[in-house]
Amino acid sequence: MSLATNNAESKFPSLQRLPNHVAIIMDGNRRWYKKHREECGHTHTSGHYYGAKVLPNILNAVLDLGIKVLTLYTFSTENFGRPKEEIQEIFNIFYTQLDKQLPYLMENEICLRCIGDLSKLPKGIQTKINHVSRMTASFSRLELVLAVNYGGKDELVRAFKKLHVDILNKKISSDDLSESLISSYLDTSGLTDPDLLIRTGGEMRVSNFLLWQIAYTELYITDTLWPDFTPQDLFEAINVYQQRSRRGGK
């Protein structure tokens, strides 16, 4: 684990030893809003609006680097415990951004994939996710993975339920159980595990995110709140990652 230096002059990372898969816990929207309440003049959840505005610049930087997978913790299973007004605004922003960014995704050959228990999302958002996913399914320059109504524990429970059904139906045997088989039942089936997990906002925890997948992932924590996160902050995280010696527990 590493804390950020918040170096605004972070250089463009070496193209050697780039992480193939970067995951980000985009934390700090509400704290950012509390700091900027007077200048924002919106509701108490408006930090999410400003957080959404960060994403195009980060996507451009990821494309420039040639990273292949970017996974973003967009909405957790626990977030359903927040005030209804905040949840509604988050969903409104999410729907609007999916609609607005579809031309950008197609122009830049970005494939959208959403993970989590999507069945509990509003029907309109489910429909929009399915539409954007279908429209971008053939692209491979970058896979953008949005974790929506996602929780690492919930993902494992859902995976084990599917495994149990397949064992009962004799599609597989309990003797077949292995790490790779379990991985194939997860939402992230077919994806490599994250090489680098970035958390903005300074909190020192993983918040039920990709619990199975981050067993050997490098962690990087920055105090920068998500609406203030820039490509330079991303470069700094990758520069630190490139200085690590990854041993995979060996």
Swiss-Prot record:
Highest taxon above the source species: Bacteria
InterPro entries, alphabetized: UPP_synth-like, UPP_synth-like_CS, UPP_synth-like_sf
Enzyme class: transferase
Ligand binding (substrate): 28-32, 48, 76-78, 80, 82, 199, 205-207
Ligand binding (Mg(2+)): 27, 218
One Pfam assignment: Prenyltransf
Listed cofactors: Mg(2+)
TM ranges: none
Segment forming the signal sequence: none
Co-factor: note: Binds 2 magnesium ions per subunit.
Gene3D superfamilies named among the record's database cross-references: Decaprenyl diphosphate synthase-like (3.40.1180.10)
Cystine crosslinks: none
EC number: 2.5.1.-
Family, similarity comment: Belongs to the UPP synthase family.
Known function: Catalyzes the condensation of isopentenyl diphosphate (IPP) with allylic pyrophosphates generating different type of terpenoids.
Quaternary structure annotation from Swiss-Prot or TrEMBL: Homodimer.
Name of the molecule in the record: Isoprenyl transferase
Organism: Chlamydia pneumoniae (Chlamydophila pneumoniae)
